[in-house]
UniProtKB/Swiss-Prot annotation:
It comes from Staphylococcus epidermidis (strain ATCC 35984 / DSM 28319 / BCRC 17069 / CCUG 31568 / BM 3577 / RP62A). One of its GO terms (biological process) is CTP salvage. This is Uridine kinase. InterPro entries: P-loop_NTPase, PRK/URK, Uridine_kinase, Uridine_kinase-like. Belongs to the uridine kinase family. It is an enzyme of class 2 (transferase). It is found in: Cytoplasm. The keyword Cytoplasm applies.
Length: 207
């Protein structure tokens, strides 16, 4: 019997995915739980020049190595440890370093495109979409990128208008239809998070 419960958590940039993920992980104390962030799986671009890498659209599904993510998840589900890739954002390509990752009772796959790939979705026991108003998402992104990543407000707004918003509308928003539950208002929706956690606890206890 499959002993690993796989949870997918998707939603736009700044929607509150991480807050929801952390709340669920905290509520599942007593079980071994780990986060497998989709951001770990940006494609290796070492074959490209640095100038070519600078043009990478990280808000497009093609930026992710879903084949490797699916392969790692299959191994983890079968009780095998894996080496998870890491990404060097300063060089815009995969790092040589990896992270040792052991099988867990619950694995949470979190990322903007967590529900976009058919094969990946089929591996998930529970699929969650965190739905947050666009105005709030851009405000959160502005705060994060200017304070934590040293970017100017102008550059963040330009990226949002020219890349993030159109990619969200074209690729991310449509994945909402695949969710088992949609959590409005992101991490502030404690009731939805509690209901979701109860569902996950029930699934884990049956395995």
């Amino acid at each position: 019997m499959n002993q690993t419960t796989i949870i997918g958590i998707a939603g736009g940039s700044g929607s509150g995915k991480t807050t929801v993920t952390n709340a669920i992980m905290k509520n599942l104390e007593g079980h071994s739980v780990a986060l497998l962030a989709q951001d770990y799986y940006y494609k290796d671009q070492s074959h490209l020049t640095f100038e070519e890498r600078l043009e990478t659209n990280y808000d497009h599904p093609f930026a992710f190595d879903n084949d490797l993510l699916i392969h790692n998840l299959k191994d983890l589900r079968n009780g095998k440890p894996v080496e998870v890739p890491t990404y060097d954002y300063s060089q815009h390509t995969r790092s040589k370093e990896t992270i040792a990752f052991d099988p867990k009772d619950v694995i949470i796959v979190e990322g903007i495109f967590a529900l976009e790939n058919n094969t990946l979705r089929d591996m998930m026991d529970v699929k969650i979409y965190v739905d947050t108003d666009a105005d709030l998402r851009i405000l959160r992104r502005l705060t994060r990128d200017t304070k934590e990543r040293g970017r100017t407000m102008e550059s963040v707004i330009n990226q949002y208008l020219n890349v993030v918003r159109p990619m969200h509308e074209q690729f991310i928003e449509p994945t909402k239809k695949h969710a088992d539950i949609i959590i409005p208002e992101g991490g502030s929706n404690k009731v939805a998070i509690d209901i979701m956690t109860t569902k996950i606890q029930s699934l884990v206890s049956k395995k």
